[in-house]
Amino acid sequence: SEINGDWNTIALSAD
């Protein structure tokens, strides 16, 4: 996956 794409998923989970 794109780094940004993975970060977005992590951010949503963290939030």
UniProtKB/Swiss-Prot annotation:
GO terms for cellular component: extracellular region. Transmembrane segments: none annotated. Belongs to the calycin superfamily. Lipocalin family. It is found in: Secreted. Its main location: secreted. Keywords: Allergen, Pheromone-binding, Secreted, Transport. GO terms for molecular function: IgE binding; pheromone binding. This is Major urinary protein. Binds pheromones that are released from drying urine of males. These pheromones affect the sexual behavior of females.
